[in-house]
Amino acid sequence: MTIAPMANDLEDFESLLEPDFDAKQFGNDLLKATNNNDTTILDLNTPLKKLNYDLHEIDSRIDQLMNSNPLEIIELIYKNEHVNSTIVGELKPSLGYMNMSYDRLKNQVLDPYERARKVQLALSKVYQTSFLLRGALLYIHLSNKLNALSKTAQLSTSTAINLASLHYQLEITLEENKNLKSLRKIKQLDQDIVSPNKRELITFLSLQMCKECLNSIKIKSNKEIISQLAYSLYLLSSQEFESAINKIVLSNVTMSSQILSKILNSIRMFPDAFNEVVEKGYNIYILETLLQNIKTDNVTNSSRSIAANKSRLGNLLSEYTSMKSKAGSGTPRDLFWSKVSSAFKKDFDISVNRGGPVGKSLLKNKDFIINTMKQSMKKSSDNSDYQSYLDVMLNSVSISLNK
């Protein structure tokens, strides 16, 4: 039995059956079609009549369709029911198996995983809280110890060294637990105790280190104290450590330059004067050796990046050199002899260019000056590495003496 004629019974209403049918757009188009653009009165009766007529027409056609094709309609109904029952019957075992598999997956994997995840999250929070409290207790203990030690007596070198160690431990505690800085108690301790004490301690260590390196006697007899002061200052601030070394070197440069400047008028006294300068250069050599013997492999400085901490060279001399490399001055001896040479060259050139008895005396005694430098510079170091600094000093007089 054919059912093809049924497809044409609603052909006048095909637009209403489209998947993208828009009732608002259809109503708007109907209003436009039944109203005149030239009038200001909106006619709603005509489109309503049109819609009522269409509804009546659809009902009429449905009744006519059912009356004229009852068998086809019944056949379609039974066919759809049969298809539905067939699909359900064939898929039901598979769906049941899938549901059973999912239930087993849910019970054996998903639910235990979710419970484990919640437990892990809770444990993580407990661990974080415990770690934070442990760090806070350690920081408070170290702060109280630092406060008590700083109030026991007048600040001395040994006390300052112990305080520097406590400050370093506080720094490590903060490095290991960044969240400590967010605690109000920690902020208060840092503001009231730690930071003020650290500033005072840095100033004290820097001054003491400069005093201990003031002359040859002190620097030779107090090597251990100087090493401890340098290491403690470095623990507190690598920048202040560098600054203190520079002050020591430049202080010796100033005294050496004054000695050499005064001797230009009496060149026969040059050997004694230059020996004094060499002795100061030897003091810087001792300082350099002390720095080289102080290991920093296990030091972590929060003022540097993690990458910088990992790439350390192993001792205070290499740390100082790496900080000075940007300025181009290198080691303390590099700084000392380059500054002394530069100052002496300036004074020497002025005296030679000015002429007169002093200038003539300098030119006349050029070999004497050079030989004195060569002999004396050997005493500026305990090994043969003085040669490069000898060349630096010879360069300070080479141009003038070649005139």
UniProtKB/Swiss-Prot annotation:
Give a GO molecular function annotation for the protein.
identical protein binding
Question: Is Protein transport found in the keyword set?
Answer: yes
Classification via InterPro entries: Cog5, COG5_helical, COG5_N
Subcellular location per the Swiss-Prot or TrEMBL entry? Golgi apparatus membrane
Q: Name one GO biological process term.
A: intra-Golgi vesicle-mediated transport
Alphabetical keyword list? Golgi apparatus, Membrane, Protein transport, Transport
Can you list the GO cellular component terms from the UniProt entry?
cytosol; Golgi membrane; Golgi transport complex
- Highest taxon above the source species: Eukaryota
The UniProt entry lists the main location of this chain as Golgi
Its placement in the membrane is given as: Peripheral membrane protein
**Sequence similarity:** Belongs to the COG5 family.
How would you summarize the oligomeric state and partners of this protein?
Answer: Component of the conserved oligomeric Golgi (COG or Sec34/Sec35) complex which consists of eight different proteins COG1-COG8.
In its miscellaneous comment, the UniProt entry states: Present with 468 molecules/cell in log phase SD medium.
The function of this protein is:
Acts as a component of the peripheral membrane COG complex that is involved in intra-Golgi protein trafficking. COG is located at the cis-Golgi, and regulates tethering of retrograde intra-Golgi vesicles and possibly a number of other membrane trafficking events.
- What is the protein's name according to its record? Conserved oligomeric Golgi complex subunit 5
What organism is the protein native to? Saccharomyces cerevisiae (strain ATCC 204508 / S288c) (Baker's yeast)
